[in-house]
């Protein structure tokens, strides 16, 4: 190790930027202030206030507000559940264990049906009830139930208030700035994505880029929620922001549709690629208007109206340009603060889908885990069994919704072991020698500030540092009055580690569904929703089905199963492109009854080839042949409406042709 590595510049306090110092000081002061206030309010376990302040330490105002609201609602719901369940079953340990396990299983199941703050509230409702109720097994007076429950809720609220106050005193980056920057970056990235997808090659990089764009647009919905809570102007513009996100998803769909047409177009004009690149370069400039775009794409205007392939590509390209320019104008209005509620229609939020099978399985896992640990604790009369139950409940509820639960549980195990060793040194080496809280704060403040800085400066270990900060309070366990019992300390820490280890074992036995199974369930749900789109009165609108489809696709974005990801993406793109054609056919009108019957026949062909179980290859081949015959016949028709219909039908042909390579039924794609 060279001498330069020991220089002062490499120490976290000197490497930190001003923004990092602001973040670290804000969270450190909030945690120390919460501990102090809870201590002098004579709450029996004030360290929970410090933990609560650590949990809501988001870098933005909107994140703190939304997280705090979810935490308060979840804590109140969990406290009420603990009072009701423990109050009626306190003298019946087996019934108490059964009711608490059922409640935590229900919360695990419920949080899978929601996102963001509502899911977080159900998580809090689950393990707050565990934190309050499981330690009650050793009490004899029913009146103590209320005292413990109100103390826990008060500690949580104290931590939230301290975190919110410090966010107002030392504010961080603006949610509005983060959202607008993300929208602008995605707006520019769509042009890069179009340039990549409109190439004739088919590579894994294209699939990964498409998944990345979809995931990034859906992630911006979280930024929209945080901006909604941080500033009144974005609450007024919420409908516009929803419409912008839907518009970016629609542009992603149009880019994919244009790619399918380019791949199925036997002889496009020779200068198509050069004109498209010139168009994308022009759209990247904020000074480009509709006249500039019209001049650039004018050479691609079809001269032969009977060439339905050329007409279809031309119409879809114009639609993409119009969408992109409209989105540019809306972004400019948002950035300049111009309030105009007439430009974009009110749009619902992004739709989502819940995997009910996985949610039920997660709830069952939580129930079985807690019943197993509780039965062992009751049979062995283990005094620290409540701690094992509490940590197991937290682990099962929190990590049922993550993509890699074993990795998260292993990290938590490592965190608990490190904290056990650290808290032993602090508790029996330092805390026994001090008598006032302010003396302990002189040690705690620089320690927390350093840990906060290290979390920011070491991204690879940010999750570890974050867990060390959050769980440190419950291991040091600053109480009023302080308690120093080595046997209880050792027993409690061992119980916490055993609880997480048993939760890990439960995940190993009752394993989450494989990515292949999840992919099949998502594909089946996609096909079921698409069949509904073919009905006369579909349940979902065009934009709702679009956002729901992209939500399905994003669910396996972190999967290591390349085949599962590929076929989920392929089915999503195919069904989405077909749904856009169906909606356009439904809106297409003609005074010619024969043409209307042709339109209805195309939709009926889709009903015949597609079902929830999958697609029949023989029916698919016959359908593609029939669609090609319809296109050729309509192209020779004397009515302009017929040639327009031929272009729409050819888009349907291009979308369905991607399924010719689908595996047979009984495999992943079916």
From Swiss-Prot:
It is a multi-pass membrane protein. InterPro entries: PHBA_efflux_AaeB/fusaric-R. Keywords: Cell membrane, Membrane, Transmembrane, Transmembrane helix, Transport. It is found in: Cell membrane. It holds the Pfam family FUSC. Its main location: membrane. GO terms for cellular component: plasma membrane. It comes from the Bacteria. GO terms for molecular function: transmembrane transporter activity. The chain crosses the membrane at residues 23-42, 47-69, 76-98, 118-140, 153-170, 381-403, 410-432, 437-454, 461-483, 493-510. Belongs to the aromatic acid exporter ArAE (TC 2.A.85) family. This is Uncharacterized transporter YdhK. It comes from Escherichia coli (strain K12).
